[in-house]
């Protein structure tokens, strides 16, 4: 057999865990492919033995989504080459981390238009789920900014696909949760990168004003980055902060008064703060080092991410505030920011039926053994979101039954089932999501 096949306990234990540290399912074998042919062989091996196969990038899933209990884990770390960076595009392997993508593109004064907050995830990983970021109000998701993909389907066939060639596969794989094929290569869009970023961190005491200013910042398109965050102060009160950023290249500089004049914040905690663009997009790197040092990086992370209609978000936060803020601790927070639905084109990513929705991400760290309570809280939040027309962003630590998945995808379910039959006829891919196509 080609590629690298591991059956030792060290590799199997590692593949049976993820960043979430809530689910642990050790596989009997880990395959590290080096070529497309290795990927094809692993898939055919899996199908012939009636096993399942999960693709692993950096292992940043939160609820066992990259695990294969009793099956095969396909570790894509050797697919780590940035092949080409040219004007407006880059062609890269699926196992490349986004931090390495931007290192390559910034050397050509270009950048992906949408980046997630944490750049340690892989290209194939985020393109399989969506990929939200602070610039999604202008550019949609990372799945909306990919021009073509190279994929090995569940039946072991290698295909290149785009919006004009093999478009059914292209639409299925973008945000398809790994259900239809293994992304091995992607050609993504790039935009010109500015040199610097001016940051504005605006404080609010009123939730409605905080959310209204976010919608205003989204609509006027004056800012390149829009994200809100909620924390709990020492007295148990919610505190709101709107993080805005404007990209620029000296000698031209942002006009602070023009940018902020329409906003109704209480105070500005950080004003006229300029940083290098590369440092800004990789701003989580230092926090990761700190959390690794304290050990919290390795604790359970029962995260929940929900998409809530804009006209429901204020009431939702108010009525669920105790559930949202329980157990946030020192390193936890709630992210909340608006996104228009128009730029989102990947058909298998459910979004609310409205013009604008809010991403609401509850990012909690649990002491070992305390995650079960938070997972139960996540499930309740998911049900409450569903009741107001919201949907889950499917990277959650939320238990989902096969029936829940049918509800989650709604009218898309029949198309998803057809795509599963066509591209993964043996139903071997992505068992960690616990979907059923019987």
UniProtKB/Swiss-Prot annotation:
Entry keyword annotation includes Flavoprotein: yes
UniProt KW keywords: FAD, Flavoprotein, Oxidoreductase, Plasmid
Cofactor: FAD
GO terms, biological process: cytokinin metabolic process
Gene3D superfamilies associated with the record: 3.30.465.10, FAD-linked oxidases, C-terminal domain (3.40.462.10), Uridine Diphospho-n-acetylenolpyruvylglucosamine Reductase, domain 2 (3.30.43.10)
Upregulation: During the interaction with host plants.
Entry's Gene Ontology molecular function annotations: cytokinin dehydrogenase activity; FAD binding
Lineage top rank: taxon: Bacteria
Coiled coil: none
Chain positions recorded as FAD binding sites: 55-61, 65, 117, 122, 128-132, 183, 393, 430-433
Pros-8alpha-FAD histidine found at: 60
Function: The FAS-operon encodes genes involved in cytokinin production and in host plant fasciation (leafy gall).
Family statement: Belongs to the oxygen-dependent FAD-linked oxidoreductase family.
Protein name listed in UniProt: Uncharacterized oxidoreductase ORF5 in fasciation locus
Organism: Rhodococcoides fascians
Gene name tied to this protein: fas5
């Amino acid at each position: 057999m080609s590629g690298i096949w591991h059956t030792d306990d060290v590799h199997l234990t590692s593949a049976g865990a993820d960043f979430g540290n809530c689910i642990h399912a050790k596989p009997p074998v880990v395959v590290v492919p080096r070529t497309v042919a290795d990927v094809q062989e692993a898939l055919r091996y899996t199908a012939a033995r009636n096993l399942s196969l999960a693709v692993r990038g950096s292992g940043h899933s939160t609820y066992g989504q990259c695990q294969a209990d009793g099956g095969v884990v396909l570790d894509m770390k050797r697919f780590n080459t940035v092949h080409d960076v040219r004007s407006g595009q880059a062609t890269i392997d699926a196992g490349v981390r986004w931090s390495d993508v931007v290192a390559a593109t910034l050397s050509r004064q270009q950048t992906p238009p949408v980046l997630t907050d944490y750049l340690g995830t892989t290209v194939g990983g985020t393109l399989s789920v969506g990929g939200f970021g602070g610039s999604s109000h202008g550019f949609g998701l990372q799945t909306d900014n990919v021009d073509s993909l190279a994929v090995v389907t569940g039946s072991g066939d290698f295909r290149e696909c785009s919006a004009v060639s093999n478009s059914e596969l292209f639409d299925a794989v973008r945000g398809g949760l790994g259900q239809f094929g293994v992304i091995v290569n992607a050609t993504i869009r790039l935009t010109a990168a500015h040199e610097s970023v001016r940051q504005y961190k605006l404080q609010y005491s009123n939730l409605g004003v905080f959310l209204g200013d976010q919608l205003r910042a989204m609509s006027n398109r004056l800012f390149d980055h829009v994200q809100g965050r909620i924390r709990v102060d020492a007295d148990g009160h919610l505190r709101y902060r709107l993080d805005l950023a404007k990209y620029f290249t000296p000698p031209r500089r942002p006009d602070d008064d023009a940018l902020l004049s329409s906003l109704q914040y209480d105070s500005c905690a950080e004003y006229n703060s300029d940083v290098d663009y590369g440092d800004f997009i990789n701003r989580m790197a230092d926090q990761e080092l700190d959390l690794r040092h304290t050990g919290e990086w390795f604790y359970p992370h029962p995260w929940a991410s929900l998409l809530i209609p804009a006209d429901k978000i204020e009431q939702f936060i108010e009525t669920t505030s105790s559930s949202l803020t329980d157990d946030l601790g020192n390193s936890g927070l709630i992210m909340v920011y608006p996104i228009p639905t128009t730029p989102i084109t990947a058909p298998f990513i459910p979004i609310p039926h409205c013009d604008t929705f809010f991403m609401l991400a509850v990012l909690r760290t649990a002491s070992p053994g305390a995650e079960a309570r938070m997972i139960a809280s996540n499930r309740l939040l998911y049900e409450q979101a569903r009741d107001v027309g919201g949907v889950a962003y499917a990277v959650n630590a939320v238990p989902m039954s096969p029936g829940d998945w049918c509800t989650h995808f709604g009218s898309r379910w029949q198309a998803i089932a057809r795509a599963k039959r066509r591209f993964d006829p043996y139903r071997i891919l992505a068992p960690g999501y616990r979907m059923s196509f019987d």
